[in-house]
Amino acid sequence: MPERAARTILAFDFGLKRIGVAVGEPELRTAHPLPAVSTFPQIQKLVAEWQPAALVVGLPLSVEGDAHAMTRQAEDFARRLERRFKLPVARVDERYTSVEAEHRLRGMKKKAVDSVAAQLILEQYFDEAA
């Protein structure tokens, strides 16, 4: 069982096939990728295991910062998390996180890219909160 910080945060990179996941501690401003998931029961297990104080969801926006179909689906996902887990859910602009994740992980599996994108979303959240 992982050690729990009082303020552990889970972040999600929402996708239609997979959801990238990362865990982090704001006090240390560290984030680490976890295996990607694809179902709410898997998310429930992560929430029970890590007992986060809050959740973060990346919102995919266009280059211009406009919402589109995936933005609305990610927002729906964030609202489902709020309702189901009764935790605060922050939204973070995730433009370019998947591109940066692919750059960091050239040649690795797509599942790893999704969770590294979630790690980048969480790192951005920490930067914005500082």
Located regions from the model:
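Phosphate- and other anionic-substrate recognition elements at nucleic-acid/protein interfaces
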Residues: 2-12, 16-130
